[in-house]
Amino acid sequence: MRRGFTLIELLAVLVIIAILSVIVVPTVTNSIEEAKENTYNEQVNIIKQAGESYFIDSNYKVLENEQKVVYVTDILESEYLSNSQIINPKTEKEMTGCVLINYYSEQYHYKYLPEDKDCKKYTNIKE
């Protein structure tokens, strides 16, 4: 008539839990990081598409081999993005920056630049 667990049984359970946590924790952490990366990429695509719509609807022009930017704040103000702000899932901070618009090979190309300092290198589309 035993009434409890022996020390060896308790240690065995602790070892099993430790082994499982060593296996499970990195897997869960990697899954979370991957989900954040995927969400970030989706946010970037949404911003680029909104920048493209803003550019097209505003009838702005970019000449061959010219580069101009439209700021995320301008896109938000003109309601091409439905949220009042877009949050970066990696940093939990608001996504700012701009969409860089290039015209070459007879086609427009759009790229999201996350830092305002990178945007200042280019002319604003409104100028």
Predicted segments with their positions:
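N-terminal single-pass transmembrane signal-anchor helix
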Residues: 2-28
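Low-complexity, S/T/G/P-rich flexible repeat/linker segments used as non-globular hinges
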Residues: 105-127
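Aliphatic-rich helix starts adjacent to a transmembrane/signal segment
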Residues: 27-48
